């Protein structure tokens, strides 16, 4: 099955995949281009090295790193988190459907709004979603704890998919998008491995997940005022697309 899927997707990618819209004579927004040469000339952007010199780059990286930690730690330990709060396994598993529905709605509305607003409000909402999620973990034994996790984790998930797709081309252009996004993904992968470990150690050392959750809340609150510095950099060598 794995071999069939691998070969099938490889063949499909070879037939249908295109490196950029300009190869099809299109612009990223879907407007038909009048000239292929003009379209190719419109692919602009700055290098990874230049992007790393901007505060906004690291602020978004930090937010996505925290999202990677929380986003993997919660599903990894979700059953035990509920058991510690006196809830059963079915309650834990039942959280994922409403969470996914909220994530889809947030992603759709956020995507529409991102074409019309700065990404900083989206980043703030992203961080707030993670804060609400972790506070919900701590107070899961309260009546509002479980809804807090569902809403917060849904917001986090919707914003995570949006910002990981929109931020890098908008802030740094598309010419070096592969290098920039790969660099960001590497941090996300590291965070995904670290998150479950930290929450697991919290249980081993302190007897609950609260220490890890409060630690995440502390870092996220620290990041909130930094969103004021996450403005679009408008670097030299990059023009609007």
Model-derived features with residue positions:
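A membrane-interface helix-boundary motif in multi-pass transporters
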Residues: 1-3, 200-219
């Amino acid at each position: 099955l794995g071999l069939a899927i691998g070969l099938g997707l490889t063949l499909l990618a070879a037939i249908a995949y295109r490196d950029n819209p300009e190869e099809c004579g299109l612009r990223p927004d879907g407007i038909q281009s009048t000239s292929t040469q003009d379209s190719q000339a419109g692919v602009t952007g700055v290098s990874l090295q230049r992007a790393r010199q901007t505060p906004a780059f690291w602020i978004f990286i930090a937010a996505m790193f925290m999202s990677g930690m929380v986003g993997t730690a919660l599903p990894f330990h979700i059953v035990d988190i509920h058991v510690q709060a006196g809830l059963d396994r079915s309650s834990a598993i039942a959280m994922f459907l409403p969470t996914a529905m909220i994530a889809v709605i947030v992603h759709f509305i956020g995507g529409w709004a991102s074409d019309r607003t700065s990404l900083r409000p989206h980043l703030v909402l992203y961080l707030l979603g993670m804060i609400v999620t972790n506070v919900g973990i701590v107070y899961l034994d309260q009546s509002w704890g479980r809804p807090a996790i569902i809403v917060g984790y849904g917001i986090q998930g919707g914003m995570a998919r949006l910002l990981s797709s929109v931020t890098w081309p908008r802030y740094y252009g598309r010419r070096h998008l592969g290098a920039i996004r790969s660099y960001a993904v590497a941090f996300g992968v590291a965070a995904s491995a670290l998150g479950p470990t930290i929450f697991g150690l919290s249980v081993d050392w302190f007897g609950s997940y609260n220490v890890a959750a409060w630690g995440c809340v502390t870092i996220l609150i620290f990041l909130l005022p930094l969103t004021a510095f996450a403005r679009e950099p408008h670097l030299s060598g990059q023009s609007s697309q």
